[in-house]
């Protein structure tokens, strides 16, 4: 499989950093990789530290900001709330179709990464969630989790939610939380017995640079 849906156990787990790292690692290997964030909230075009700018930079600035997403909203809320703030709604069929168009272009030499918003069960519309989008696309998920206290429960809950609708999980990435009091190795050891059926379980130390993308080579 050459297309992946990146989601998380919740907000601020580092999905965009991980997606950008995957993209940078793929491109470093000579692959023509692309990343997209179908729905963005908290969007500000002038914010050069935004998710969109990070993904664009990791991709060599080859994509326009408009090409990165199908929907963008200003309010930093769940997509359905952010859309309502602007007096609109998200067209589910349009969103799925937009994503499928990009998934269809993925090849071994040109992998595609689609990054969700928020967590697995973050609402997109009043009846659909990020889990539903992953299921509709029928592509494997890369699940990002933090390591702060409570993350084991959050992670296992997210895994069960995905499995309940037969979404395959390709990888679990433990992205070290900035405020975690639990050593990364201990966090990995604690959750490992519960995730043995997931093909890849990787750890990512808390860093501020994409230069440490080498740990993601196993996913490519």
Language model features: what each stretch is:
Residues 1-5, 32:
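Extreme N-terminal starter segment of soluble prokaryotic enzymes
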Residues 5-22:
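Glycine-rich phosphate-binding P-loop
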Residues 17-89, 93, 101-103:
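N-terminal phosphate/diphosphate-binding loop that engages ATP/GTP or pyrophosphate donors
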Residues 37, 142-145, 170-176:
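Short internal beta-strands
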Residues 79-124, 131:
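Phosphate-binding/switch loop-helix module in NTP-utilizing enzymes
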Residues 125-148:
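Inter-motif core of Ras-like GTPase G domains
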Residues 125-133, 156-159, 184-189:
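Charged helix-capping and loop-helix junction motifs
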Residues 160-220:
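C-terminal lobe/tail of nucleotide-utilizing enzymes
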């Amino acid at each position: 499989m050459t297309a992946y849906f990146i989601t998380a156990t919740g907000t601020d787990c580092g999905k965009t950093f991980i997606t950008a790292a995957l993209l940078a690692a793929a491109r470093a290997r000579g692959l023509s990789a692309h990343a997209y964030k179908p729905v963005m909230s908290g969007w500000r075009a002038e914010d050069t530290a935004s998710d969109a700018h990070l993904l664009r930079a990791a991709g060599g600035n080859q994509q326009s900001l408009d090409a990165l997403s199908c929907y963008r909203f200003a309010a930093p809320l769940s997509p359905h709330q952010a859309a309502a703030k602007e007096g609109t709604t998200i067209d589910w069929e349009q969103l799925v179709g937009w994503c499928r168009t990009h998934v269809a272009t993925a090849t071994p030499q040109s992998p595609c990464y689609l990054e969700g918003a928020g967590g697995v069960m973050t609402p997109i519309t009043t009846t659909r969630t990020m889990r539903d989008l992953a299921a509709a696309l029928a592509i494997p998920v890369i699940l990002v989790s933090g390591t702060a206290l409570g993350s084991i429960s959050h992670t296992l809950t997210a895994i069960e939610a995905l499995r309940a609708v037969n979404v395959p999980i390709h990888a679990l990435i433990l992205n070290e939380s900035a405020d975690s009091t639990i050593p990364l190795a201990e966090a990995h050891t604690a959750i490992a017995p519960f995730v043995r059926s997931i093909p890849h379980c990787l750890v990512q130390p808390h860093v501020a640079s994409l230069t440490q993308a080498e740990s993601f080579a196993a996913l490519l």
